[in-house]
Amino acid sequence: MTDKTILERSLGIFNLEKVDRDIFSWTGKNVGYKRIFGGQVMAQTLIAAYKTIDVEHYAHSFHSYFLRPGDMDKSITFTVDRIRDGKSFTTRTVKAIQNGEAIFNCSCLLYTSDAADEGLG
């Protein structure tokens, strides 16, 4: 496998497919590892949260829990719970589910550029 192929397959992990309003999916792709790297599922949950927001936001805080190991060969479903949509801050809880069980859970607080300009971020 060439370096270009490895890079293209690796970047594909960030392409989440919209299934429903607050549900996204990633189709498992083996890039040479059996288990999912924790940073991958963390990034994917943050991407899922961002996909539920219309205005540009920045991550302010991110609290997460690794619950079970993930399998690179199997798809992951990301469910987003819209906790709060405020003027400056937005809160989301995202669960990554594989084989019907949560493998990762996070709560993230995101803020707008206006909040950052006011020194709130």
What annotation goes with each model-predicted range?
Residues G70-L110:
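Hydrophobic/aromatic-rich structural module bridging two neighboring secondary-structure elements via a short loop
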Residues G119-G121:
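N-terminal low-complexity segments that are often proline-rich with Ser/Thr-Pro
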